[in-house]
Structures are given as C-alpha cells and as structure tokens.
C-alpha cells in the first residue's frame, strides 16, 4: 500500500465520520436520525411530522408543531460483513464480522414562537464508517483499522407563509474524527518476491533487501494516521400542504468542507523509501503531518405524505446525492508538497423509499417500509475498508403514546447487501454484508 492509498483511506474516514459505525446507507452516508423513521425505512421524512426528529431532515416542518417538543434516542447497528479470498502468497484472506456493532444516538428539540415562526435544534450524524481486521491479517496493508466518527450540530428556523407554504433554513456544524491503522500482513513476502523476480534480485544488494522485506512481521504497523476537524454547511426545506391530509416537501443539504489534518507515522525502516517499493512511506516510527480537504456531497430529497384514510397513510421519498462531486483526493505535506493525487470517480446515487402507517387508536401507531440504496462507488474503486454495495431495506416499527404528551418509538430494519468482488492492490476479495438495526426514542411535548 502506498502513502497515496493510506491518505485515500484517511480521507474517506473523515468523510465517513458523520457517524461512529459502519455506514449503512450507500457510500458512507447515514440515515439513522430517528427510530420512527427507522421503522418506515426513512420514507417520507421531509413531509411527515410525527416527532421532532423529522425537523433534522426538513426544517420547514417546524411549523407543524404547536408545542415545544423533545425527542431523544439511539439506533443500535449490528452488521455482519464478511470478506474472503486468497493472497498471491497463498495465505487466506478470510475475515468475518469486519464491521463492529455501534450505538448511534440522536437528540432533537422543536419550539414554536408564534403561528408563523419557530426554531429547532438537533444532534445527529449523516456519514460514518468503521471496519476492523486482525493485526496479523494477510491483507493488513489494505485492511487494518478504519475508525471514523462524526457529530452534526444543527440549528434551524422556519416561517409559515400561509396555510399551504412553509420554509425552513438550518446551519450545520460537523465535527469529524478519524483513526487509520494499516499492518504489514504478507506485504513483506510479496515485496520480497517482486524484488527477486526483478533484475535487482540478481545482485547482493537486492537479495539483502528482499531478505529484509521478507522478515517484516505481519503485525508491523506500516501506517498510522489520526486527526480531527470541524466543517460547516447549511440545509433548507420547503413544505407544501395541499390540505391537512396531503403534504409534499423538497429538502436540500449542502456540501460540508472538512480540512482534515492528520499525524502520519510508519514503523518501517526508512531504507525502503529509496527503492520505489509498493509500500507506505517509511518514517522509522517518527511522526509527520499530512493535510487533506474533503467535500462531503450535497443531497436533494423529495418526499410525500398522504393520509388516504382516517387510519392509513402512505409516505415516500426519492433522495439524490451528488457523489460525482467526489472525484479526487489530494493530500499535501506541511511544506505543500503533494503526497498523492488520486482520481476517485464516484457517480451520483439515489435512494428510494416507500412506507405506510396504520393509526390503530389514540395509543398505538404501526408503520412499515422498504427502501433501495444505490451505491455510488464504481466497482473498480471498492476497497475492503469501505466494502460498499447496493442495499435493500425491510423495516417495521411502532409508537406507543402514554398520553397526549409522552410517547415512545421502536423501530427495526433489516438490510441486505449484494455480494461484490473487490480488487485492491495485489489482492482479490469477495465481500458480502447484511445488518440488523434496532432503534428506540422517547418523545415529550411540553
């Protein structure tokens, strides 16, 4: 793995940082901002106003609340992502459960000011990723640990123009933190083989270098990078109410620019830097700085909610994320030298969701939904630290209202990903993944 590849992974770590777990939407985007939404596969989120969590998706929904309302909870993600393959060295590349479980918290508050104005605040996350491989894993030079966390702080306001139109605007502050570690695995053996097959392998110097490379332990830390940074953006929404039973929404979330600063080190001997070998830049354990600017892509979403019967409603969404804005990653040193410049070539991607809600009585509400997440990652750019794939959702949930003020939401989703092939460095992998998500939120209206 080259230093270029290392910083590629670290950049994705920052991008993915908007939540502290394996990303369970396409790319490294996340949706898990409420448990009621989880139960309907996040369908119609820009137009539904059944709890304060919806306001983080569409600030215009603030005008639908006539009392200060609070919601807090978490979604537990239990992924099952497995990797298989065989290294050119003959060692197995099999690794099970590479994505750890995690809790994803959320908190929301909405307060009307009068009949026309209101404000809201939330703590959520919109991107995230985590993968972990054993320190002695054969493909450790491209696996290792990728631990990415973020937190999104949102403050928003809304204005009701008339009975039909409402508008909302929000400000987002995103805190991102990343830790990347890569280990030698069998890379030393592969490098030694390359040297011995080249003309250098016929020289005493080349043979000595090959012997040194072959002696690198599998758990040698060949790359380490960590860092944190703030980024800022905005979001907006429009809500159109045809009548009290039918409403439609258009929402927008801007790019977030994160100027990531990381500390890079490698335990490899600096002698390897003199031979142009396919390994990270060696620092002999010393630390140096690297800088990378990453733009998290903008997102558009159209949503609808139709209460077709006193007890039944349908809701739906189509989200479009401009992943084509993510075309390259470029890292520089403190002196401004380019450490790498890599073409990523992501494509724009969409998410489509459909759900229904059954209002059983004043206490019980039931919901369900399905969704499809289109992956923005081209097949040739997949990696085992971000084994992205198209995903299909099946979701169900319920709300129990204790009284007119307090209620609790419970949601569950099953996500199934396609089996994909990954070519990364000298390795060829196959990856398959699925996940269960469980969420609960408590809601209170003052």
From Swiss-Prot:
Residues 1-25 form the signal peptide. SUPFAM superfamilies: Porins. It is a multi-pass membrane protein. Gene3D superfamilies: Outer membrane protein transport protein (OMPP1/FadL/TodX). Keywords: Cell outer membrane, Lipid transport, Membrane, Signal, Transmembrane, Transmembrane beta strand, Transport. One of its GO terms (cellular component) is cell outer membrane. Pfam families: Toluene_X. Its main location: membrane. One of its GO terms (molecular function) is long-chain fatty acid transporting porin activity. It is found in: Cell outer membrane. InterPro entries: OMPP1/FadL/TodX. Belongs to the OmpP1/FadL family. Involved in translocation of long-chain fatty acids across the outer membrane. FadL may form a specific channel. This is Long-chain fatty acid transport protein.
